[in-house]
A protein has these predicted regions:
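Hydrophobic helix-coil surface modules that form long, contiguous segments used
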Residues: 1-106, 135-138
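Active-site-adjacent bridging/hinge elements
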Residues: 19-24, 82, 106-112, 163-176
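Second-shell loop/turn segments in exported
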Residues: 29-39, 122-123, 183-186, 199, ...
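Acidic/His/Gly-enriched intrinsically disordered linker/tail segments
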Residues: 98, 130-195, 199, 220-222
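Catalytic Zn2+-binding segment of zinc metalloproteases
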Residues: 109-124
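Amphipathic alpha-helical substructures
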Residues: 178-182, 186-273
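Beta-strand-rich binding/interaction modules
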Residues: 242-243, 253-328
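Short acidic/polar inter-strand loop motif in beta-rich domains
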Residues: 330-335
Length: 335
């Protein structure tokens, strides 16, 4: 429940639903920001349309308002149909050329499916809310600005997880032995969880990934869910046992660290790539890592799928002429 009282100007916008009806999308701002409100929040109707189509579940509420308040300590909050933002979002049109808050706007909107429509059944499962909201930022960047910009922003998200984990320690994504619920609001639940979803998307492919999400949302709407419900939805769609993925990423800690060596055999026109998992095995498991290796030779680029699931493993690939470049995890699947 949220109540906002103040001298707001209400800047009105709309979202056109698939049936042609219009839904209110209003922006509540202080009077001096009335002229900038649509510049700040104006992508919101397009976000609602895109996310509704992508998820296969129409925005499930009857309005979407965004209210800017002062002295708010939590950045923003996904109150159903009435999201609040701190006054940091106030930027004029010139300032918005340098920095906008579309990632936060997308994040809070996505919570209306993940958090509001389907709610994590416990603080331990908070990542079911926050990882999806975090990943929405990638999805919007990918749609609005292209894959390169999305990948660039994803690198920042991933780096923030590494730095946070190094400073504060590692824990499971689904974390049962936290001390206080505030401990759950960290770069594991948000950043790491978002990148794990991207790994799963890369592994399953877009069709199965988004159908799995649609099934998860429709089966669990207006209910509380835990991460096993998410796994079961993906398994039903793809027909594959995904316990290995969820066990290592949701119930396991830390992340893989890979050492890579290569050896070219000119007499057989082959290259041997040796991979080693060098993470601390007291903190992390030996990961099963599906990925792709790209070999660039005189005839162009050749992509080979592999599964690396041992401490040390070698893979041999053919080449033509000479090897110009080798890229392990060519599709940037891995955390």
């Amino acid at each position: 429940f949220m109540m906002a009282i103040g001298e707001f100007k209400v800047v009105k916008d709309t979202y056109k639903k698939p049936d042609g009806t219009l839904m209110e999308v209003n922006y509540y701002v202080e009077p001096e920001w009335e002229g900038d409100a649509k510049a700040i929040f104006g992508e919101t109707p397009a976000m609602i349309a895109y996310f509704s189509k992508l998820l296969g579940v129409e925005y499930p509420w009857d309005k979407y308002h965004q209210i800017v308040v002062r002295d708010y300590v939590s950045g923003a909050m996904e109150n159903t149909g009435a999201v609040i933002f701190g006054d940091y979002v106030y930027k004029n049109k010139r300032e918005l050329l340098d920095e906008n808050d579309q990632s936060t706007i997308a994040h809070e909107l996505f919570h209306h499916w993940f958090g509001d429509l389907v709610t994590a059944e416990s603080w331990s499962n908070l990542t079911l809310n926050e990882s999806f909201a975090n990943y929405s930022q990638y999805l919007w960047d990918e749609y609005r600005y292209g894959k390169d910009e999305a990948a660039y922003q994803a690198e920042i998200v991933e780096k923030n997880y590494y730095e946070s984990a190094k400073a504060k320690g590692y824990h499971n994504l689904v974390w049962f032995d936290y001390e206080t619920r505030e401990d759950m609001f960290d770069a594991h639940s948000y950043n790491k969880g978002g990148r794990i979803l991207h790994m799963l998307r890369s592994y399953l492919g877009d069709e199965a990934f988004f159908k799995g999400i649609q099934l998860y949302l429709t089966k669990n709407q207006f209910k509380a869910a835990e991460f096993h419900q998410l796994r079961l939805a993906f398994e039903e769609v793809c027909g594959e046992d995904l316990n290995w993925f969820f066990n290592q990423w949701y119930l396991g800690s830390a992340h893989p660290i890979l050492d890579i060596k290569q050896k070219i055999n000119a007499s057989t026109n082959t290259i041997e790539i040796t991979l080693e998992q060098s993470q601390n095995l007291e903190l992390a498991p030996i990961f099963k890592l599906p990925m792709h290796v790209a070999i660039y030779d005189s005839l162009g680029k050749h992509i080979y799928p592999i599964v690396f699931d041992k401490i040390n493993q070698s893979f041999t690939f053919p080449f033509n002429g000479g090897v110009n470049c080798v890229i392990v995890d060519d599709q940037q699947m891995l955390l």
